[in-house]
Amino acid sequence: MSRIGKSPVTIPEGVTVDHKDGVVTVKGKLGELKQEIRDIDVKIEDNVITFERSSEKSDQKAKHGLYRALVNNMIEGVTNGYTKSLELVGVGYRATNQGNKLDLAVGYSHNIVLDLAPEVKVETISEKGKNPIVKVTSHDKQLVGQVAAKIRSFRAPEPYKGKGIKFVGEQLRRKAGKSA
């Protein structure tokens, strides 16, 4: 049995979980998330969700822990939310946000304007003498990671000087320059 899949998920106060027609819906103070679940039996009793598989097929074994982790992430998201922070390292690199648009100046001849989904909130922090920071926040963990990866892809950090957009706390593999 899957080590992750066999452990139950507790439902905190203020969160409602519903399972109908193979779709689990989680509602909380930060929003609502849905996940389609196939081949795994979901049981909701006394604020505890358990996941059981009907057979020992390899695809069901693989999905057992996956669906448990996805539902747990959904509950965590509608309760506390998720945040990823990116740091813009480079001279003249700037980030500003106007509503649901993020404007990045990262060394190209033009600014990059990124339209964001309504579920995603972006905050830009610019202090004098420090690198600008972009914080991506949402109740959907997958969406936060996807938007943060897209922002990072506009100017991934290069290994020689370390310039580019990197996650806060990310360790870059640096290379030595050519020797004289």
Curated annotation (Swiss-Prot):
Record-level GO cellular component terms: cytosolic large ribosomal subunit
Single Gene Ontology MF annotation: rRNA binding
Keywords from the named record: Ribonucleoprotein, Ribosomal protein, RNA-binding, rRNA-binding
Pfam families in UniProt: Ribosomal_L6
InterPro entries named among the record's database cross-references: Ribosomal_uL6-like, Ribosomal_uL6-like_a/b-dom_sf, Ribosomal_uL6_a/b-dom, Ribosomal_uL6_bac-type, Ribosomal_uL6_CS
Disulphide bridges, residue numbers: none
GO terms classed as biological process: cytoplasmic translation
SUPFAM superfamilies found in the cross-reference section: Ribosomal protein L6
Keyword GTP-binding assigned: no
Keyword Kinase set for record: no
Function in brief: This protein binds to the 23S rRNA, and is important in its secondary structure. It is located near the subunit interface in the base of the L7/L12 stalk, and near the tRNA binding site of the peptidyltransferase center.
Alphabetized HAMAP family for the sequence: Ribosomal_uL6_B (MF_01365_B)
Family to which this protein belongs: Belongs to the universal ribosomal protein uL6 family.
Entries under NCBIfam families matching the protein: L6_bact
Quaternary assembly: Part of the 50S ribosomal subunit.
Name of the protein described by the UniProt record: Large ribosomal subunit protein uL6
Species name: Christiangramia forsetii (strain DSM 17595 / CGMCC 1.15422 / KT0803) (Gramella forsetii)
